[in-house]
């Protein structure tokens, strides 16, 4: 038996073990264990189906090779072997993809944070443009988008916007969006027709639960203050706005979108946990990168990952040297798969 066949046999054995465990009284009565084992079985279900088919094809090849010695059946066996060898090759390709280590965060919802960087008002306008493109992409994927916090600028853009995106495989599709996005275009306010360069940062933070990120209450500094509107005017007369600082890391989150202090505190704490988890992921990625020839990107917000050049209708993805001359169509349709699919393929190729 080949190394691949042995590996697939062990996966099938584990799948059968999990099936038996999930029907046992001991596991059924333990919700935590039941959930844990159900997730594990679900994670290997696709590879298990492919494994059964592959091992069946190997058995078919073995049987037909034996039939080659039979004068009456040899021609039929030859034809059958041709078909089986093609199936074997196709299954091996599919199985190699399925055996690539799965990111444990791939099925999580995310907090998407877009923040204006260099470029003043134009950067804020592009935050709004890119946010709309992400919303269109979410619509295509049947995901749900909820605005958690937003800070508008004076020209219709955003200084910062944070949204929660929920749906199947959200993190797996959007995790490579983290970093600095640069835009080159002529602003509407530019009378001389000069091209301006602006930049915004994108952060992708998996939504986490209390089990995944545990925070010691004594590590938190919680401040309350009055929420302010545009130009500093007061939008309510109570101390409803909340700022939470995680003292060991100095990561701080402010929230004032809700009128209730309790709701603002709850939102701020969720985003703080997501940021702490994001920090853990970045540290792990940097450690893993040392063992790999190349990486798509660390997810570091300071890393310039993409340029949107409107005069040339060009989108350049710097991490994989991808250039597309369909920028406006991508932004208006939200069809970000044109960029995301090559990024995912590149990341997977690093494990082959």
Swiss-Prot record:
Gene Ontology terms: cellular component: cytoplasm
Coiled coil: none
Keywords (A to Z) from UniProt: Cytoplasm, Methylation, Protein biosynthesis
Post-translational modification: Methylated by PrmC. Methylation increases the termination efficiency of RF1.
Chief site of localization: cytoplasm
Location(s), subcellular: Cytoplasm
SUPFAM superfamilies linked to this entry: Release factor
Pfam families associated with the record: PCRF (PF03462), RF-1 (PF00472)
Residues recorded as bearing N5-methylglutamine in the entry: 233
Region of interest called Disordered, as start-end residue ranges on this chain: 288-309
GO MF term (any one): translation release factor activity, codon specific
Cross-referenced PANTHER family: LD18447P
HAMAP family noted in UniProt: Rel_fac_1 (MF_00093)
Stored NCBIfam families: prfA, PRK00591.1
Biological role: Peptide chain release factor 1 directs the termination of translation in response to the peptide chain termination codons UAG and UAA.
Family membership noted in the UniProt record: Belongs to the prokaryotic/mitochondrial release factor family.
Protein name (Swiss-Prot/TrEMBL): Peptide chain release factor 1
Species assigned in the record: Helicobacter pylori (strain J99 / ATCC 700824)
């Amino acid at each position: 038996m080949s190394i691949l066949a042995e590996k697939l046999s062990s996966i099938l054995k584990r799948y059968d073990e999990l099936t038996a465990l999930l029907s046992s009284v001991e596991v059924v009565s333990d919700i935590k264990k039941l959930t844990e084992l159900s997730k594990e079985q679900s994670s290997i279900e696709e590879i298990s189906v492919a494994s059964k088919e592959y091992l069946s094809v190997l058995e078919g090849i073995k049987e037909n090779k034996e039939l080659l010695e039979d004068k009456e059946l040899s021609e039929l066996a030859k034809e059958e072997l041709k078909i089986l060898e093609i199936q074997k090759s196709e299954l091996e390709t599919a199985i190699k993809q399925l055996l690539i280590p799965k990111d444990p965060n791939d099925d999580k919802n995310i907090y998407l944070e877009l923040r204006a960087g260099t470029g003043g008002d134009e950067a804020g306008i592009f935050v709004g443009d890119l946010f709309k493109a992400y919303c269109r992409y979410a619509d295509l994927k049947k995901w749900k988008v909820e605005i958690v916090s937003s800070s508008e600028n004076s020209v219709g853009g955003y200084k910062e916007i944070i949204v929660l995106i929920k749906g199947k495989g959200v993190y797996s599709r959007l995790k490579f969006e983290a970093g600095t996005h640069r835009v080159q275009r002529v602003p509407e306010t530019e009378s001389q027709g000069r091209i301006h360069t602006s930049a915004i940062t994108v952060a992708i933070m998996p939504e986490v639960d209390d089990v995944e990120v545990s925070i010691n209450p004594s590590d938190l500094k919680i401040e309350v203050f009055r929420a302010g509107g545009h130009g500093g005017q007061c939008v309510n007369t109570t101390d409803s706005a909340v700022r939470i600082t995680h003292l060991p890391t100095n990561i701080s989150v402010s929230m004032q979108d809700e009128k209730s202090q309790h709701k603002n505190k709850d939102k701020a704490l969720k985003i703080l946990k997501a940021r702490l988890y994001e920090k853990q992921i970045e540290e792990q990625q940097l450690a893993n990168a040392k063992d790999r020839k190349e990486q798509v990107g660390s997810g570091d917000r300071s890393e310039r990952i993409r340029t949107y050049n409107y005069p040339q209708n060009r989108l350049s993805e710097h991490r994989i040297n991808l250039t597309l001359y369909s920028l406006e169509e991508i932004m208006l349709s939200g069809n970000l798969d044109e960029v995301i699919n090559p990024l995912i393929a590149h990341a997977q190729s690093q494990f082959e």
